């Protein structure tokens, strides 16, 4: 059996369009997950050539499998790409994550624990103040205690 034919427990599907800095932060966060049996599928709705080149470099450095699906930019066709990603997935359990959401370290684990046949699991996001969002960086996401540092300012 080819490695790409092998099943994985979870496919995480991320819609994407030119937001490479956010995607890099998401990849850093996925590298810190407590649950490791997952793949990431980037459903790209026509990103620029320079962005795709940077994405390919980023994909090569990940400790988890990443598939990049791309279609020509012919207007907003995000849902078409999401459907293609579902078909391409190697798991029976799918998680959809927007391209500007940084998952906490137990994101995949908690989704798997909540999984029930015939049900959909929906999570919440935390709307960050603009100043906090604009100050996000790969270095901050990679730093120890990132989640703790992020949550406390929001609570007080």
Regions found by a protein language model. Give the residues of each.
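Conserved donor NDP-sugar-binding/catalytic core segment of glycosyltransferases
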Residues: 106-141
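Glycine-rich, basic loop-to-helix element that forms the pyrophosphate-binding segment
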Residues: 72-89, 106
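Short beta-strand/loop segment that forms part of the nucleotide-sugar
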Residues: 37-47, 67-71
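A conserved acidic beta->alpha catalytic loop
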Residues: 29, 44-55
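The conserved acidic donor/metal-binding loop of glycosyltransferases
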Residues: 98-102
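N-proximal low-complexity "stem/linker" segments adjacent to membrane-targeting elements
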Residues: 1-32
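Short alpha-helix within the catalytic core of nucleotide-sugar-dependent glycosyltransferases
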Residues: 27-28, 52-53, 83, 91, ...
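Short aromatic/hydrophobic "clamp" motif used to bind/position activated sugar donors
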Residues: 94
């Amino acid at each position: 059996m080819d490695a790409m034919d092998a099943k994985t427990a979870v496919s995480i599907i991320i819609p994407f369009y030119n937001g490479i800095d956010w995607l890099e932060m998401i990849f850093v966060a996925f590298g810190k997950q407590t649950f490791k049996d997952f793949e990431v599928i980037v459903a790209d709705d026509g990103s620029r050539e320079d962005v795709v080149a940077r994405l390919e470099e980023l994909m090569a450095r990940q400790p988890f499998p990443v598939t990049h699906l791309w279609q020509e930019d012919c207007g907003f066709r995000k849902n078409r790409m999401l459907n293609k990603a579902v078909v391409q997935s190697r798991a029976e359990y799918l998680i959809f994550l927007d391209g500007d959401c940084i998952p906490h370290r137990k994101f995949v684990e908690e989704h798997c624990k909540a999984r029930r046949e015939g049900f959909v699991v929906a999570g919440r996001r935390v709307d960050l103040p603009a100043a906090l969002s604009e100050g996000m960086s790969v270095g901050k996401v990679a730093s120890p205690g990132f989640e703790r540092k992020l949550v406390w300012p929001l609570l007080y």
